[in-house]
A protein has these predicted regions:
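Active-/binding-site microenvironments in catalytic and ligand-binding cores
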Residues: 1-208
Length: 208
């Protein structure tokens, strides 16, 4: 029997948690079938950093590539999920405990429960030294189950910059609470939005 794909994306709804001060997600039926005579037509507004999304380097570096300029092959392929639940900070020292040889995409499961409708007040933080460590291992994509790889109130974003400097791309707000550690196929394609600093993704995995 073929193994099933698992959706690890947050659902967009008008109640989804949003970064404080950012554009909240809103969907509405702008024109109903009764109005048009043939179809319903929906309309939505959102920040590109709401829900499960990919960061483009342009998000934190005005001279760096935007989302449509990134290689889509980064977001398709074999990935490894590791359980780092309980760590307040995650870097070289914490990840050295895992077998990561041959891994190219790494998804970090840090939370036992995620509520997409509540923006968190505290999250695990990735250390700046994780960028060099991932490059040494040949990993070019890191995914986390919270809104940022840096602290929520951090303005320097040193980990974002360190990851970019070492060729590591970022996925945020994955849903991994019900996913077991192991090897998976991953598809998490960003939309082709010209000039954008990020994009929502529909992230799915399938056990290898």
């Amino acid at each position: 029997m073929e193994k099933r794909w698992i959706d690890i994306s947050q659902s967009f709804s008008n109640k989804i948690g949003t970064w404080p001060g950012d554009t909240p997600f809103q969907f509405e039926v702008a024109f109903s079938k009764e109005q048009t005579g043939s179809v319903n037509i929906g309309r939505f507004t959102t920040s590109v950093h709401t829900g499960t999304h990919a960061d483009a380097p342009f998000h934190f570096d005005s001279d760096a590539p935007t989302i449509e300029q990134l290689d889509i092959n980064v977001y398709i392929g074999r990935a490894k999920v590791v359980d780092v639940t309980g760590f307040e900070t995650i870097g070289r020292e914490e990840l050295q405990a895992f077998e990561l040889d041959g891994v190219e995409r790494l998804l970090l499961k840090t939370a036992k429960h995620v509520c997409a409708e509540q923006f968190p007040t505290q999250i695990p933080v990735l250390k700046e030294n994780i960028g060099a460590f991932l490059k040494e291992k040949g990993i070019f994509l890191i995914g986390v189950d919270h809104p940022s790889v840096d602290a929520l109130d951090d303005k320097q974003l040193l980990t974002h910059h360190a990851l970019y400097q070492h060729g590591v791309h970022i996925l945020e707000n994955l849903l991994l609470q019900d996913v077991s550690p192991g090897d998976y196929e991953l598809i998490a394609l960003p939309l082709k939005i010209q000039g954008a600093d990020g994009s929502p993704v529909r992230a799915v995995i399938r056990a290898m």
